[in-house]
């Protein structure tokens, strides 16, 4: 009975995902990331459109930044997706 109760508590905590925050890359290195502050629910990656499509900026955002004629911005909502 105790095992069942403990299992239910663990499953409840995992399902509720208490205190979940988004994690986004914030450098060009793929293994470095930061936890986004409250209210910033998107990860973004800005890359040069020409010639090499090199990432110029990554981070967290409340809204997706706009692309320009030189920079393409891609936004996503899952951990480390940028």
Swiss-Prot record:
Signal sequence, start to end: 1-21
Annotated keywords: Cardiotoxin, Disulfide bond, Secreted, Signal, Toxin
Gene Ontology cellular-component annotations: extracellular region
Top-level taxon of the source organism: Eukaryota
Pfam families: Toxin_cobra-type
GO molecular function: toxin activity
Presence of the UniProt keyword Disulfide bond in the record: yes
Tissues where this protein is expressed: Expressed by the venom gland.
Main location: secreted
CDD domains: TFP_snake_toxin (cd00206)
Cysteine-cysteine disulfides: 24-43, 36-60, 64-75, 76-81
Places the protein is found: Secreted
Family in the record: Belongs to the three-finger toxin family. Short-chain subfamily. Orphan group XV sub-subfamily.
The name this protein goes by in its record: Cytotoxin 7
Species of origin: Naja atra
């Amino acid at each position: 009975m105790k095992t069942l109760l403990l299992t239910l508590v663990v499953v409840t905590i995992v399902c509720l995902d208490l205190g979940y925050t988004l994690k986004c890359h914030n450098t060009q290195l793929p293994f470095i990331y930061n936890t986004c502050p409250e209210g910033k629910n998107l990860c973004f990656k800005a890359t040069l459109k020409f010639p090499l499509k090199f990432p110029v900026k990554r981070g967290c955002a409340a809204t997706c930044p706009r692309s320009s004629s030189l920079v393409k911005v891609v936004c996503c909502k899952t951990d480390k997706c940028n």
